[in-house]
């Protein structure tokens, strides 16, 4: 894992859920958790990052709403700054669909919240 990827995983960890790269979620994972898909970009480039939080249980709706509020505080309108070994990033909300509410296609009891971010990388 690169310094950028680890820094983003740690940043998203501030949402108080375990964070896994998409496709690498351990079989023994329990709800709730967050999956993350990171694009690759060279320094001075920008890339899209998608994080999806998944919830199951009686409080899934309330937990999902609380996470959405927390994500809006973590990534304010003006963006958030992140530094890591060898570089830095500005993290912004991606367009008009920053947060999208989801239901799992296989199990309608599983609720999700997709968070889309635009990340601009800088060389330090």
What are these regions (language model features)?
Residues 25-27:
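Short, glycine-/polar-rich solvent-exposed loops and beta-turns at beta-strand/coil boundaries
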Residues 1-23, 37-124:
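Charged, amphipathic alpha-helical segments and their flanking helix caps
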Residues 29-38:
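A short, hydrophobic beta-strand-centered structural micro-motif
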